[in-house]
Swiss-Prot record:
Region Domain II, annotated ranges: 65-143
This protein's encoding gene: ruvA
The protein's name in its UniProt record: Holliday junction branch migration complex subunit RuvA
A biological process from GO: DNA recombination
Source species: Pseudomonas putida (strain ATCC 47054 / DSM 6125 / CFBP 8728 / NCIMB 11950 / KT2440)
InterPro entries: DNA_helicase_Holl-junc_RuvA_I (IPR013849), Hlx-hairpin-Hlx_DNA-bd_motif (IPR003583), NA-bd_OB-fold (IPR012340), RuvA (IPR000085), RuvA_2-like (IPR010994), RuvA_C (IPR011114), RuvA_C_sf (IPR036267)
């Protein structure tokens, strides 16, 4: 089992990234909440990981902090929730926000996540309520905090990367493009910031 990786961030193509550890490149998929906190390509990064073994592939998922990984593990234990849906939920909501939704049994934010209807949201909240009794919301203490502004990319490539990332989370291409287009003053924003703002807009509607 691979529990943690520390190395050089070699590639970043939302929601995928490659970390070079002593010459070996590990490909991971991460929730957008982790992606926002990644340093620039070429810098050192540490992520907590979860390995999913399938007949046709070994899939590695990365998280900024242990709480995120534990949440992911709780989610994929639920009936009908695979890694893709778990990442979509975690990309739209921070850990504390999702915990608060569970505590309040509030489906309003969950139903805006692709693949989650009202009945599914209600079932997830009921199943998670007992599991989350031991969880307490607290300010997130991430290991991947960047003190500076997010890196700036060219407008066309940043928007294309953002649309691609949203589609990978389950949004339709038209929905993703519309969400990006609705962002005001987006010139010069990185793909990470475009993803963050578009998800916030779609989840909060």
């Amino acid at each position: 089992m691979i529990g943690r990786l520390r190395g050089t961030l070699a590639e970043k193509q939302p929601p995928h990234l490659i970390i070079d550890v002593n010459g070996v490149g590990y490909e991971l998929e991460v929730p957008m909440t982790t992606l926002y906190r990644l340093p620039k390509v070429g810098e050192t990064v540490t992520v907590h990981t979860h390995l999913v073994v399938r007949e046709d592939a070994h899939l590695l998922y990365g998280f900024a902090e242990k709480r995120e990984r534990e949440l992911f593990r709780e989610l994929i234990r639920l009936n009908g929730v695979g890694p893709k849906l778990a990442l979509a939920l975690m990309s739209g909501l921070e850990v504390d926000e999702l915990v608060r939704c569970v505590q309040a049994q509030d489906t309003s934010a969950l139903v805006r996540v692709p693949g989650v209807g009202k009945k599914t949201a209600e079932r997830l909240l009921v199943e998670l309520k007992d599991r989350f009794k031991a969880w307490e919301t607290s300010p997130a203490m991430f290991t991947l905090v960047s003190d500076g502004p997010l890196p700036v990319a060219s407008e066309s490539s940043a928007e294309a990367d953002a649309v691609s990332a949203l589609v990978s989370l389950g949004y339709k291409p038209q929905e993703a493009s519309k969400a990006i287009a609705a962002i005001k003053d987006k010139a010069g924003l990185s793909s990470e910031e475009l993803i963050r703002r578009s998800l916030k807009g779609m989840i909060s509607k």
